[in-house]
Amino acid sequence: MGQFAVILAAAGRSTRFGDPKQKKIYAELEGRAVWLRALDPFLTHGEVEQIIVAIAPEDRELFDRRYHDKAAFLNLDVIDGGAERSDTVARALERVRPVCQFVAIHDAARPCLTENMVSAVFSAARDHGAALLATPVSDTIKRTGDDRFTSETVPRRNLYLAQTPQVFRRDWLEAAYARRAQAGADVTDDTQLVEALGHRCVIVPGSTLNLKLTTQEDLKLATAILRLQSNFPRETSGHPFADEAAMWADLPKLKASDLFDP
């Protein structure tokens, strides 16, 4: 029996996506909704005991109309999220089954996650109590004042861009959320709350392919990534991201028309 519960945070507002007709997580990506793509690696993972999908209350009618049968078939627990991300996770935590010892939180707008990435971050969470995918900062970072004039260049050594999944011992995460009010309003991810309790979260090397959709251009990039992953399936041997270089090295062999609509 699996030890992990997965919370899919799907209650965002998609204000920057630029489609007045639908939110980004309901957009079609290679024949399936983005949120379903984000769930794929968890659906086939043997350590996952429960999946909770937290949607915006105003999306309930749309979700039930489009996805009720799929959610029932996949045995998903679909709940209403809150006004902010932390509110959504707090509500989902209340629904985690007693048997689950670890909780993974994943953005519904990250549809290119692979099962190898999931296995790596699950393993690190078992060993260390808390783990997240992240990528090293490669660009030069500038700090500015409110006037947008630069004040300093921030050293990028040991700086990382946090991704999801972020995975925690259940008791650590529940304790962190019990003290959420003390963290203030500026909570941007779940590791921030766990760190406030004095716990350290280990970083597992992530991938730039595990992008978070923000704009419709990101949707085109995600389409390309999924097609590449389909052409170059990942194996379980070696470290989980060993094949990325080969994938991108072979990219010129694909026609642009294979990846993007004209």
Regions found by a protein language model. Name each.
Residues 87-102:
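Active-site nucleotide-sugar/metal-binding loop of Leloir-type enzymes
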Residues 6-8, 53, 105, 130-133:
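Structural beta-sheet core signal
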Residues 8, 35, 92, 106-107, ...:
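Residue-level signal for inorganic ion chemistry
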